[in-house]
């Protein structure tokens, strides 16, 4: 079970009392057998980065046989949890809303104002919670966690203000790490270019 200090009402609450927790869409149920006008970006396992972000370039296109209801599409504030290792949770924002979420994931949609999605996103990605998820998942042959396990998590909530402080710092730190990775990638390209040019000049000088 998941425990968080709570200073408001006291007592434990299950995640399902604060949010809807359900599996994503079984794609075969709504998939068109022929080219369709109802095309949606699809969140697949390749999209999910270990740091808890979605790589949009990896998304597939899902062709549905009919317009999909909102319940099948990601919404800003949703938390998508990968059902298989490493059980990464991602927070949906404006850039990743409106995407089909497959049954490879659990969709958590917070419905109670006493729980901030950004805080729950941080919490689900902590080592302590990942370890509990892993312990549950390894008890079955597929090594996958299910929606019921997440729905039954017991929460003891922090105040909304404390949740906000933690989540803001987490998002700031995550953004800084992303920028540092981008900078490191650009430097690698720069160094490779300089070395390549130096090699070419050296060859011409022979």
Spans of features found by a protein language model:
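Basic, amphipathic alpha-helical recognition segments used for DNA target recognition
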Residues: 15-18, 106-156
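Sequence-specific dsDNA recognition surfaces
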Residues: 16-31, 48-76
């Amino acid at each position: 079970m998941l425990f968080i200090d709570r200073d408001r009402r006291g007592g434990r609450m299950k995640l399902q009392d604060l949010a809807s927790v359900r599996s994503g869409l079984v794609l075969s149920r709504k998939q068109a057998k022929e080219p369709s006008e109802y095309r949606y970006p699809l969140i697949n396992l390749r999209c999910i980065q270990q740091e808890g972000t979605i790589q949009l370039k990896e998304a597939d296109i899902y062709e549905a046989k009919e317009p999909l209801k909102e319940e099948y599409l990601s919404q800003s504030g949703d938390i998508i949890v990968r059902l298989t290792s490493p059980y990464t949770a991602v927070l949906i924002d404006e850039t990743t809303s409106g995407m089909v979420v497959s049954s490879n994931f659990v969709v958590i949609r917070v419905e109670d104002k006493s729980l901030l999605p950004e805080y729950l996103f941080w919490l689900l990605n902590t080592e302590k919670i990942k370890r509990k998820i892993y312990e549950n998942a390894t008890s079955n042959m597929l090594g996958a966690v299910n929606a019921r396990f997440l729905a039954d998590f017991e929460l003891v909530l922090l105040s909304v203000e404390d949740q906000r402080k933690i989540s803001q710092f987490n998002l700031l730190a995550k953004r800084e790490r992303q920028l540092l990775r981008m900078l490191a990638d650009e430097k690698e390209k720069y160094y490779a270019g300089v070395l390549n040019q130096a090699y070419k000049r050296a060859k011409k000088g022979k």
